[in-house]
């Protein structure tokens, strides 16, 4: 028995040695590695004391994320509501957000800050990673980041080469095509080009004319060129253009049970069902937008430090038409045109070493020029309504003033007060009618 025990020991040790040296039948899972540049942070995102959510390229494609709004389904405490067009792009994070004017959540695309809130809602494609940083990020990213920050990174042609084509079709004639090409010319130069077209007939119809109330068509193109003349110096040029044309603001009237129960047979509510009604507008709201975002990133790797510079120019030109009475009657409508240019320059310098102490500092400057015209038009039904109100007011004023004087004279002549007032009003009304009456037609200019 002792012999058997002694002989079994080296056999077991030999088996353990085989496993430790390497088992060819064992399968090792290695997560996808995405290499991105962090010009401001000295530590990896997972090592930083903040709450964040990250998506790699495969996850973005599997979730079918088409724009930033789609992320609100998967990111906690993050919301980007749908207001009916790409114009309105309010972002809320942890309950902090801005409905108008300056945003409270910032967006960076390949290191380029997007400052115009009217350009936040754009089609995302060619994206390799998305980081959502929760909470204030003003220390490193400055203004408009009180609620948080969203960073998007495009696929790097130095790391990925090839041609990708994506075709999709869905309900309500959703259609989309995306094509991109990535090529590495040599060890120092690489480029990528991409383009897309997307559209959908929409889910709502305008009851006034039967048109699609949320029809959308959009297209765009993107180019990127990377140049590494030396081991220390890198250049990254990005240009992105997108055009959107959509029927927007498919708003319908909300009708309650109480309103229906009190509606008469002549009421426009008679025969409707409680809830939100289909859009019914005599003017179909629409939105058109051109945006161009260009940026030049420069990075220099020194001895123990990195210098990063991002210079960008952003262009916005859009047009919006909204039937602001949301009714089949022609009361009021709004048109708005925006023309904006934005220049930004961001410079950051950070340490690059293995010591316990890391430092970073920088500067940011921007110039934003925006011209907005937004006249409100009073249309035919509104002008007719106001004309009638003013005409009635003027007519009654004249009638009462003239009849009062005539009645006083009749009473002084011995007529009773009741008969005098009645006679005076009849006579005055006849006199006004004989003179042509009172007719005021007004037109309200914006």
Predicted segments with their positions:
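Outer-membrane beta-barrel translocator/receptor signature
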Residues: 89, 103, 116, 125-128, ...
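Periplasmic-side early beta-strands and strand-to-turn transitions of outer-membrane beta-barrels
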Residues: 159-160, 168, 184-283, 316-331, ...
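Coil residues (strongly favoring Ser/Thr
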Residues: 23-24, 32, 416
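Outer-membrane beta-barrel architecture
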Residues: 70, 92-94, 151, 180, ...
């Amino acid at each position: 028995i002792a012999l058997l025990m002694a002989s079994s020991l080296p056999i077991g040790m030999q088996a353990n040695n085989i496993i430790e040296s390497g088992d060819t039948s064992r399968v090792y899972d290695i997560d996808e590695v995405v290499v991105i540049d962090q010009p401001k942070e000295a530590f990896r995102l997972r090592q930083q004391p903040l709450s964040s959510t990250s998506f790699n390229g495969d996850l973005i494609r599997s979730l079918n994320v088409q724009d930033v709004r789609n992320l609100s389904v998967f990111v906690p405490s993050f919301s980007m509501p749908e207001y009916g067009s790409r114009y309105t792009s309010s972002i809320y994070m942890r309950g902090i957000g801005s409905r108008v004017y300056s945003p409270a959540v910032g967006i960076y695309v390949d290191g380029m800050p997007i400052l115009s809130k009217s350009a936040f809602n754009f089609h995302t494609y060619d994206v390799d990673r998305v980081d959502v940083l929760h909470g204030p990020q003003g220390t490193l990213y400055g203004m408009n980041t009180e609620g948080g920050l969203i960073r998007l990174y495009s696929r790097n042609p130095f790391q990925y080469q090839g041609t990708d084509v994506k075709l999709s079709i869905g309900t309500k004639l959703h259609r989309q095509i995306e094509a991109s090409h990535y090529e590495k010319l040599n060890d120092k130069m690489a480029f990528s080009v991409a383009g897309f077209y997307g559209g959908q007939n929409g889910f709502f119809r305008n009851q006034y004319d039967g048109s699609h109330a949320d029809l959308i068509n959009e297209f765009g193109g993107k180019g990127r060129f990377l140049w590494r003349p030396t081991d220390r110096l890198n250049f990254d040029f990005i240009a992105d253009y997108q055009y959107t044309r959509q029927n927007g603001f498919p708003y319908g009237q909300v009708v309650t049970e109480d309103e229906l129960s009190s509606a008469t047979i002549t009421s426009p509510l008679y025969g409707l069902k409680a809830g939100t009604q289909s859009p019914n507008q005599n003017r179909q709201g629409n939105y058109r937008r051109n945006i161009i975002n260009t940026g030049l990133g420069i990075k220099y790797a020194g001895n123990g430090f990195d210098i990063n510079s991002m210079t960008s120019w952003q262009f916005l030109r859009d047009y919006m038409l909204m039937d602001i009475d949301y009714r089949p009657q022609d009361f009021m409508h709004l048109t708005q045109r925006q023309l904006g240019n934005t220049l930004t320059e961001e410079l950051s310098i950070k340490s690059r070493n293995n010591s316990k102490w890391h430092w970073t500092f920088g500067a940011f400057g921007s110039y934003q020029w925006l011209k907005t015209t937004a006249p409100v038009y009073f249309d035919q039904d509104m002008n007719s309504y106001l004309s009638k109100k003013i005409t009635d007011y003027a007519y009654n004023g004249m009638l009462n003033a003239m009849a009062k004087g005539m009645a006083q004279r009749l009473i002084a002549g011995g007529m009773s007060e009741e008969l005098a007032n009645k006679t005076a009003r009849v006579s005055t009304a006849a006199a006004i009618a004989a003179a042509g009456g009172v007719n005021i037609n007004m037109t309200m200019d914006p």
